[in-house]
Structure formats: C-alpha cells, structure tokens
C-alpha cells in the first residue's frame, strides 16, 4: 500500500510539513495496529515526514516524487533509516511538475543522466536499496511519456536497479482515449502489459489491483515462450 498525506494534483494547496504528518498519523496508526503484515510505502518528499513514518510507525518504503529536490535532508535521512527508497524523475520543483519540460537530446537520455547523478549521491551517503521511477506524467509531454515507456528499460539498464512503472489512471492514458481517470482501467491494463512484456517493470504502482494482478499472471504464463 502506498500512503500519502500531500496531494500533488493540479490546483491543490500544498500542506505544511506538520499538516502532512497530522494527516498521516491516524492512517499510519491503523496500519501498524491492524495491517502491519502488509508492506507500507509512504509517499512524501519531506525528510521529517519520512523519518516520522519509519521511526514511529515502522513504514517499509519511502516514495519520493521529488527525487530529493524538495528537501536536501531527504537522501541522508533515507540512508540513515535504511529503508528502500523510490527515486522518481522530476525536472524542476513539485509546484511546477505539471508543466512540460524540454529534454535534450531526448527524454530517456535526460532521465538516465538524472538518475546517474542522484544514485551516485545516494550511494555516497550509504543508501543501498534504490528503486527507479521514470516519473510518467510529471514534467513530461504526452510524446515524452510514451517514448519513455517504450525505451526506459533499455535506457536505464546500465544502472542495474529495479524499475517502478506508474501509469495507472494517468492523464497520458485517459486523455488519449478521451475518457476520464475513473474510466482508464482498460488503457492502464494495456500499458501495464506492454511494460511487463518488455521485461522492465519490476514493480507496478496501481489503483486497480485485480486487473494488474491478472495482467501479471497472463504475461508470466506466456514469458517462457517469448524468446523461442
């Protein structure tokens, strides 16, 4: 389960760090008391929130959509806490993440360069368990998103790190299909299947769990024959 207390949807007001923690604490307590057998990821770009979630409630992962850019203490906090860290690609700041950036020479090279720099810093600080999230829908045009989905596996291979794919209910899906986020299940499942067939989706971040599990089961059943 991925749990967050700071919405990043367009038009949302950014809460303070204290407000974010106040929102999270009741849910974290419920998880710790009733569901702690289920791994929990906390979605935050703030080091103090990450520290609270891990030290006070035992959260298992930190999912940082800012890739350490919003809080210069995040990387050292993650290294000290010793939990897996989801490092997402975001060009610029969180407040401007819905604006499209320009990538030269191309988006996959820019994303690789970004991850090389960030991973090097994390490793120097002692962080070991790093997961890469290419950041679909964040500071990218529709063309960037689809090009990156097609090429990220090959582009990020030199880093030899797990890749998380998060396209569930994203604008890149429902806008193209002229539907809505709530109606994007079919399109999301298609993209999940493509990502799985490419062999680069180690983790899928999803809203519709059953459909994603079915896609995984079908691809895994077919996988032995893909190289024949």
Language model: regions and residue ranges:
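Active-site metal-binding loops of divalent metal-dependent hydrolases
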Residues: 136
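N-terminal glycine-rich anion-binding loops that anchor highly charged ligand groups
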Residues: 1-5
């Amino acid at each position: 389960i991925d749990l967050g207390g700071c919405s990043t949807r367009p038009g949302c007001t950014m809460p303070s760090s204290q407000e974010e923690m106040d929102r999270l604490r009741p849910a974290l307590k419920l998880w710790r008391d009733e569901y702690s057998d289920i791994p929990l990821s906390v979605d935050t770009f703030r080091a103090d929130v990450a520290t609270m979630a891990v030290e006070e409630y035992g959260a298992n992962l930190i999912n940082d959509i800012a890739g350490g850019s919003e809080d210069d203490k995040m990387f050292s906090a993650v290294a000290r806490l010793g939990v897996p860290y989801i490092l997402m690609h975001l060009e610029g700041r969180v407040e401007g993440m819905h604006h499209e950036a320009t990538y030269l020479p191309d988006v996959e090279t820019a994303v690789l360069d970004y991850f090389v720099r960030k991973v090097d810093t994390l490793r120097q600080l002692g962080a070991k368990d790093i997961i890469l999230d290419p950041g679909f829908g964040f500071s990218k045009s529709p063309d960037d998103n689809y090009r990156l989905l097609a090429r990220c596996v090959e582009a990020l291979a030199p880093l030899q790190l797990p890749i998380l794919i998060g396209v569930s209910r994203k604008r890149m899906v429902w806008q193209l299909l002229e539907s809505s986020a709530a109606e994007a299940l079919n399109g999301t499942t298609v993209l999940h299947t493509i990502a799985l067939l490419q062999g680069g989706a180690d983790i899928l971040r999803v809203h519709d769990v059953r459909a994603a599990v079915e896609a995984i089961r079908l691809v895994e059943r077919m996988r032995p024959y893909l190289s024949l």
